[in-house]
Structures are given as C-alpha cells and as structure tokens.
C-alpha cells in the first residue's frame, strides 16, 4: 500500500481532462466541473466529504476521480456548491456545509502543504468528528514509499487513508489505517460503530 502523491493525483486529474481532448486543458477542466455541478442532488447521500484546501483544486479533482472510480461517491464543495464564498467565514456558508456534512457518511481530511491556508478545514474536521466520528486523514505527499503516516498534533488522533490492492487481486481499494500494520477496507470501516 502507498499514500497518495501529488503527481499521482495531478496525473489522474489530467487523464479526466484529456478525455475532452478537443478543448484546452482549462476549458476541459471547466466542462468536467460544470457537468458534476449539473448532476448534483442535494438529497444525495455521499460516502465521503472531502475537506481540502482550494489551492489544491487540480489534485483534489484527481483524488475525487480516483475515489469515484472505485465506486464511492465524493462531495467536493466547489464542485457541488459553486455559489459558496470560501474566501471568508460566514454563517450562510457554514450552514450549507453543515447540511452537506449531514449528507455524508465520512470525512477525508486531505492534508497537504496548502492545508494551513484553508479557513474551513479545521472547522469541518471538528464539526464532522462531533456529529459522526467517521474522520480519516488523507495525506497528499510529494512522494510516498510506503503507507506509514504520523499526523502532527491533533491530526495524529485520527486514522489515515492509503491506497492499495486487495490481497490476491489486482482490484484497488481505499484502506483506513489505525497504524501501519492495522488497517481495514474503507467500506468495512464505514459500517463499524
């Protein structure tokens, strides 16, 4: 198993953009996001609320595509709720995000070099942990050689996300680690109390 790397996520993002080869890269990305926005259903239950820094938008698009390719549904605020103003903290935005988190089974906290610049990530983590306790840290690293991760400060309290194949199979899966040697498939973790 390995952790997620920036290059893997950017390549995955590029692959989805490349499918719209007759558009420029920016136009293709915009078309993909607009299609996702049109398909948004406020009554839908998502497997994952993806908490992240907007500065990582391209990587997050790649991560969303990867996870959805495994059969899970992912809520990303700037895709599903383009009207939200993320540049400042407001009661209106907080209210909408609370509703969306209520519609999600878990929260993945995508930590990167840009996470410190997010106004919303710490609040999303605390709120979701308080209502559902299904929170996992998803490290986005420059490089990854294994599946070990030690979160700093309060992030070390939560399990973390890695990717890998199922034993005796080529099928990819998301794994939730409580330590490097203790882990469970994401779908099984969702069903645990």
From Swiss-Prot:
Q: Which UniProt keyword terms apply here?
A: Hydrolase, NAD
- Single GO MF descriptor: hydrolase activity
Q: Does the keyword Hydrolase apply?
A: yes
Q: Which reaction does it catalyse?
A: NAD(+) = 3'cADPR + nicotinamide + H(+)
What top-level branch of life does the organism fall under?
A: Bacteria
Locate the transmembrane regions by residue number: none
As recorded in UniProt, its EC number(s) are 3.2.2.-
Q: What's the stated role of this polypeptide? A: TIR-like domain-containing component of the Thoeris antiviral defense system, composed of ThsA and ThsB and ThsB'. In the presence of NAD(+) produces a signaling molecule that activates cognate ThsA (AC J8G6Z1) to hydrolyze NAD(+). The signaling molecule is a cyclic ADP-D-ribose isomer and may be 3' cyclic ADP-D-ribose (3'cADPR); it is not 2'cADPR.
| Record text on subunit structure and interactions | Homodimer.
Record protein name field: Probable 3' cyclic ADP-D-ribose synthase ThsB'
């Amino acid at each position: 198993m390995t952790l997620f790397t920036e290059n893997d996520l950017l390549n995955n993002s590029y692959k989805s953009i490349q499918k719209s080869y007759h558009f420029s890269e920016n136009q293709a990305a915009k078309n993909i996001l607009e299609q996702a926005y049109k398909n948004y259903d406020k009554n839908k239950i998502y497997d994952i609320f993806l908490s992240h820094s907007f500065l990582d938008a391209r990587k997050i698009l790649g991560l969303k595509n990867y996870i959805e390719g495994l059969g899970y549904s992912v809520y990303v605020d700037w895709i599903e709720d383009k009207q939200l103003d993320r540049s400042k903290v407001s009661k209106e935005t907080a209210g909408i995000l609370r509703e969306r988190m209520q519609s999600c089974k878990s929260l993945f906290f995508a930590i990167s070099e840009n996470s410190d610049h997010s106004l919303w990530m710490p609040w999303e983590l605390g709120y979701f942990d308080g209502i559902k306790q299904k929170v996992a840290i998803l490290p986005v690293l420059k490089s990854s050689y294994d599946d070990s991760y030690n979160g700093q400060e309060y992030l070390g309290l939560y399990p973390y996300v890695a990717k890998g194949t199922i034993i005796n199979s080529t099928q990819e899966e998301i794994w939730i680690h409580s330590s490097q040697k203790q882990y469970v498939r994401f779908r099984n973790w969702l069903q645990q109390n």
